[in-house]
Regions:
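C-terminal accessory regions
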Residues: 63, 155, 168-300
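Short amphipathic alpha-helical segments and helix-helix/interface helices
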Residues: 1, 28, 243-247
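Conserved helicase motor core of P-loop NTPases
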Residues: 2-8, 13-154, 159-162
Length: 300
């Protein structure tokens, strides 16, 4: 806003029930709560078809209660032990591909990187199953990751000069070997919807595999099929907004895998870490100074 000296009007569009920003603050929530600005709520949903059980599930999660009768055609819950989650997810992905979906249309989400149902384990398993080593496909190792041609790739940082941004997903189309380049170093070429971006070794840390990504990285995206594991060891990250964000990424079907009690407990938690800000008070009282408030509201 400081950079736009000639701004006459601002229109903010967002969903206060989804995850807040990674950085400090909770701007959209505070702007709405201040009741100082015109507010329009868009209630017609275009992502899913009318009557979709995905819509019903999302509404129920927002209310903190889910009707088990919704687990039918569009919404599925597969109860299984933590040790069986990986193989169950692999089976569902394989089944989806056999039904005609592409790997781009099937997205596995997980709230954490570690554990049996974590992003790292699931990425390795999905790559091994659906893009295994092949003499026809080149690959390069970077740390503990192996980047292989045809891999599903996630951009981790904004690169505006290349028109690729944090959370974008593409396909690794080509690995160039050192002997094929002038500087004798590897090069990776990733296709982001016809935008080809080249990565050299010093930039390999800006990408990772995208077979399984975090819910935070998925925000703003949409996929025909969403698959998400639920285990007790992820409880610290399972709360209503995260689960709502994950499930509402789906256009056609949601698969919830694992421990039903972890899912049910998660949707009961409104916030894991309440963000205490003063933006709402400043807007209401019309001052840039922190307004004295009840001690219980701001116990710091």
């Amino acid at each position: 806003m400081k950079a736009g000296a000639n701004i006459r009007k601002i229109c903010l569009i967002g969903d206060e029930d989804q995850l807040p920003s990674v950085g400090p603050g909770c701007v959209l929530r505070d702007l709405i709560a201040s009741e100082r600005f015109p507010l329009v709520r868009l209630n017609h949903i275009y992502r899913q078809k009318d009557g979709s059980e995905v819509i019903s599930l999302a509404h129920d999660i927002r209310r903190g209660m889910v009707d088990p009768s919704f687990y039918h055609q569009d919404v599925h819950f597969v109860s299984c032990a933590d040790t069986a989650i990986r193989d169950t997810i692999l089976h569902i992905v394989k089944q989806s591909l056999q039904m005609g979906y592409s790997m781009d249309e099937v997205q596995v989400l997980s709230p954490m990187y570690r554990g049996n149902a974590g992003i790292d384990v699931l990425n390795n398993a999905l790559q091994a199953s659906f893009n295994p080593p092949d003499t026809e496909k080149r690959e390069v190792q970077s740390g503990y990751r192996i980047f292989r041609e045809h891999d599903k790739i996630l951009q981790l940082k904004n690169q505006p000069d290349d028109d690729v941004y944090n959370g974008d997903i593409g396909i690794l189309e080509e690995v160039t070997l050192p002997e094929e380049t002038e500087d004798k170093r590897h090069a990776l070429f990733v296709n982001y919807q016809d935008n080809i971006v080249c990565y050299r070794p010093e930039n390999f840390d800006k990408i990772t595999h995208a077979y399984c990504i975090s819910v935070h990285k998925s925000q703003g995206g949409e996929y025909p099929i969403i698959i998400m594991p639920f285990i007790r060891s992820h409880s610290i990250m399972l709360y209503r907004k995260l689960i709502y964000t994950a499930c509402s990424r789906a256009r056609k079907a949601v698969w919830l895998i694992g421990d039903m009690s972890a899912f049910e407990a998660g949707i009961q938690v409104e916030e894991r870490h309440v963000r205490r800000t003063t933006l709402q008070q400043r807007l209401i009282y019309g001052t840039t100074e922190v307004v004295d408030t009840d001690e219980n509201d701001f116990p710091f």
